[in-house]
Design a protein with these regions (language model features):
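Short active-site loop/helix that positions an aromatic residue
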Residues: 77
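Non-globular targeting/processing and membrane-anchoring segments
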Residues: 1-46, 52-56, 60, 80-81, ...
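Thiol-based oxidoreductase modules, predominantly thioredoxin-like and allied folds used
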Residues: 9, 55-74, 85-96
Length: 171
């Protein structure tokens, strides 16, 4: 890793190294909530909601954070609106991390990246792919593997995901 990316979190500034905490593996889910968006992406928000109950289990073994391009105050506001207490949210204000690991064009796109830290060296281990090439006709792109139980369940039904249905941002 040649750059030490800088993020803004609820507790202040943090580097990529800081995001690991005391773990050797870090997962960063980049969600679609760029500065041009009024609200976060409903699909990303739904996916993130599935982690609220599981983060304590996951974080026994790895560090898991959520990154978006909007200012940290907006990320915190959206987190509170959903009632999330366990999500560690960070802003990528410069866009450096997003351009290097999610979208070279700095597009408002989701991303799932795994990093390792061994002997003080950070390496990129794995990325999930959810680009347009993974979309079925009339559908949004799907990740492989699809980590969201909402889609895993709907994909087993005759109705499927639906062409125009999105999860709600409030219930």
């Amino acid at each position: 890793m040649t750059k030490n990316y800088s993020f803004e979190g609820e507790g202040g500034n943090a580097t990529l190294q800081d995001l690991f905490g005391n773990k050797q593996t870090l997962v960063i889910y980049s969600y679609m909530f760029g500065p041009q968006r009024e609200k976060p992406c409903p699909m990303c928000t739904s996916f993130m909601g599935t982690w609220e109950a599981k983060l304590p289990d996951v974080e026994q073994r790895i560090a898991f954070v959520f990154v978006a391009r909007s200012p940290i105050a907006r990320l915190i506001e959206a987190k509170k609106a959903r009632g999330w207490t366990r999500h560690k949210v960070y802003s990528d204000p410069s866009g450096d991390y997003t351009r290097d690991y999610v979208s070279a064009a700095d597009a408002d796109a989701p991303g799932y990246n795994v990093f390792t830290r061994r002997d003080g060296t950070i390496r990129h281990f794995w990325s999930g792919e959810t680009g347009r090439a993974t979309a079925d006709p009339g559908q949004d792109p799907r990740g492989a593997p699809d980590l969201d139980p909402l889609w895993a369940v709907l994909d087993t039904t005759p109705e499927g995901r639906g062409k125009d249905w999105y999860p709600s941002l409030s219930y």
